């Protein structure tokens, strides 16, 4: 599935400096918040967030929380300690792939290289660690799915990144795609991947002070090879309280993301409360209209 790509570009120090300055200048452009094409239905968003949170529970809890009207199949551990489950509702002809993240943030950094790794099927550069995990999840999930059922995908953190690549594979295999929503998802590809898959129905949720969705950050080797990692899909930035900002594209990076990147090896997800799935779930719940119509 994954094949090697042979070359890595080198340049003189002067050329490197000019490329670096130009790239940083382009990365500094700020996207402007806008109105979403249609009002966000946070009751629906909550269905995705709850499933992404369930994925961290024990298998018995996942089965219980999912209810008796659906069939749930849970994977064993996959790459980097991740796990996934598939939920199929025969009556509604809807199926879900839910991918759990990992407790370690260092995997985002240690498997970052994409300049030598291209997925031969999708035809785009991908983050090696996320791609490896996605392939394992897809191998587990595909035999459990029906191509004519609406297929929804969700995940948090590393799991969200793998879920996006799974969504790409579903498209290539002709599945009927529903909505994909991710929470705190890092970047998975570059400009080539963005061009090819930007039309996918992907909505990314980002807590306002969560640095993880800005990873991997701008890296000189990426600018000189396939270009920097980029996001695609609309982005919803969740503030504290019932407030959010909608962007049709990824806004500029957090200024602190580079020092955060350098310190990843010393951090766990618990050290970054804005990145916790529990925090995402709480922010989504704050935006769900109450029964009183508030």
Language model features with spans:
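C-terminal motif of bacterial Sec signal peptides marking the signal peptidase cleavage site
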Residues: 23-26
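Hydrophobic helical h-region of N-terminal Sec-dependent signal peptides
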Residues: 14-20
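Bacterial N-terminal signal peptides that target proteins for export
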Residues: 2-14
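Non-catalytic, mobile gating and regulatory segments of ester bond hydrolases
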Residues: 28-154, 158-294
């Amino acid at each position: 599935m994954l094949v090697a790509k042979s070359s890595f570009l080198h340049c003189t120090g002067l050329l490197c400096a000019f490329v670096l300055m130009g790239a940083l200048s382009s990365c500094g452009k700020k996207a402007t918040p806008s109105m979403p094409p249609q009002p966000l239905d946070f009751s629906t968003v909550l269905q995705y967030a709850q499933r992404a949170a369930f994925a961290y529970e024990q298998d018995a809890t996942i089965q219980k929380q999912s209810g008796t009207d659906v069939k749930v199949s849970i994977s064993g551990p996959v790459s980097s300690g991740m796990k996934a489950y598939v939920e199929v509702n025969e009556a509604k002809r809807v199926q879900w792939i839910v991918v759990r993240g990992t407790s370690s943030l260092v995997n985002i950094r240690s498997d970052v290289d994409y300049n030598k790794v291209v997925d031969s099927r999708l035809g785009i550069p991908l983050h090696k660690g996320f791609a490896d995990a996605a392939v394992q999840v897809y191998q587990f999930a595909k035999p459990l799915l029906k191509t004519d059922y609406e297929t929804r995908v969700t995940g948090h953190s590393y799991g969200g990144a793998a879920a996006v690549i799974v969504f790409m594979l579903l498209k290539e295999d002709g599945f009927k795609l529903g909505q994909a929503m991710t929470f705190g998802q890092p970047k998975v590809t570059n400009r080539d991947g963005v061009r090819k898959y930007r039309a996918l129905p992907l909505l990314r949720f980002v807590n306002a002070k969560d640095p993880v969705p800005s990873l991997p950050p701008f890296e000189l080797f990426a600018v000189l090879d396939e270009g920097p990692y980029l996001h695609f899909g609309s982005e919803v930035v969740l503030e504290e309280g019932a407030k959010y900002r909608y962007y049709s594209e990824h806004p500029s990076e957090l200024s602190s993301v580079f020092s955060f990147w350098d310190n990843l090896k010393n951090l766990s997800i618990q050290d970054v409360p804005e990145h916790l799935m529990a925090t995402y779930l709480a922010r989504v719940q704050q935006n769900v209209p109450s029964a009183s119509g508030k």
